Amino acid sequence: DVQLFLEEKADDNIFNMVDAIVVGNRKLAFKLIEDQRRLGQEDGYLFSMIVRQFRILISMRDLFNREENISSDSMAKALELHPFVVKKSLPLIKRFSLDKLKDIYKQLLDLDIKTKTGLADQSWLIDLFVGKLG
């Protein structure tokens, strides 16, 4: 029962962690990253969730740029995303231009390459990314 509670807590907090990163709340993001690590989450998983959120934001921003008056339900259907994900992410896309989101995604790609080629530790690179983004 305790293990199940910890898994649910980790799942809830992973989304809060990603949101804190996206909105640039470094203090909260670092705290939630450490919480995730303490709960046993691997940096690879944390990284994949960060990448996933920025990929969603890029898709949404691109569609929003092409169809400014699109409803959130239509956007969810067009992008094959759950309506809750779209509604939760909609305010976030207004914080970034498509070019800015692409730049952030390129930074994430560079981080992934450095990790996979052994140039730097993924944990350190995630922390650096969060620090620079905020």
Task: Please state what every model-predicted region is.
Residues 102-134:
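C-terminal terminal-structure detector
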Residues 2-100:
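Small-residue-rich helix-loop
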